[in-house]
């Protein structure tokens, strides 16, 4: 009888461990998929930004889209509204030609939201750095689409 009880306890304990490890593996897979989706969205953001393509850039975001910069908070409710911004003209007047990520560090992750601390650099047409900024990007999955939903930047 004692052997049967011992086997039963061992079996229950083993099943519990199996269920816990399965849940942890699923959680890790969800987090890895979320990080991959968020990083792809950030790549899309930078490629469309450097291409000076306002519609593609707007499509790399989720809405409402929020940007904290230069002491202000700007909210765009739609891709159409965002695509009307004059960011490219303003940046080109300041000597900007293109940008790229220096670092991207995931600091929080769930299956549908990833917070990424970034450092990016802006360059002139001679590929000389003109500025470097830290930012925090919040990338979300909305209706199956990964896109940047909020940015807080030290850039003007």
Each language-model region and where it sits:
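Hydrophobic/aromatic beta-strand elements that line small-molecule binding cavities or substrate pockets
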Residues: 101-107, 120-122, 134-140
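A short hydrophobic beta-strand element
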Residues: 98, 112-120
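Short, cysteine-centered beta-strand-loop-beta hairpins and adjacent loop/turn segments enriched
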Residues: 94, 122-130
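Bacterial N-terminal signal peptides that target proteins for export
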Residues: 1-12
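A solvent-exposed, acidic/Ser-Thr-rich amphipathic alpha-helical stretch
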Residues: 54-105
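Short, low-complexity N-terminal intrinsically disordered segments enriched in polar/charged residues
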Residues: 20-59, 63
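Bacterial N-terminal signal peptides
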Residues: 10-20
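Short beta-strand edge/turn micro-motifs at domain boundaries
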Residues: 132-156
């Amino acid at each position: 009888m004692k052997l049967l009880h011992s086997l039963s306890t061992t079996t229950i304990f083993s099943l519990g461990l199996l269920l816990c490890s399965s849940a942890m593996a699923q959680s890790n897979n969800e987090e890895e998929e979320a990080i991959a989706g968020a990083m792809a969205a950030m790549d899309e953001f930078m490629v469309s930004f450097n291409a000076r393509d306002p519609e593609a850039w707007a499509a790399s975001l989720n809405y409402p889209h929020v940007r904290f910069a230069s002491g202000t908070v700007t909210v765009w409710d739609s891709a159409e509204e965002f695509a009307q911004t004059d960011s490219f003209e303003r940046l080109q007047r300041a000597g900007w030609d293109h940008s790229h990520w220096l670092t991207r560090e995931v600091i929080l992750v769930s299956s549908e939201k990833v917070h990424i601390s970034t450092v990016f650099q802006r360059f002139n047409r001679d590929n000389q750095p003109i500025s470097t900024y830290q930012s925090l990007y919040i990338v979300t999955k909305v209706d199956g689409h990964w896109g940047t939903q909020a940015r807080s930047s030290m850039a003007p």
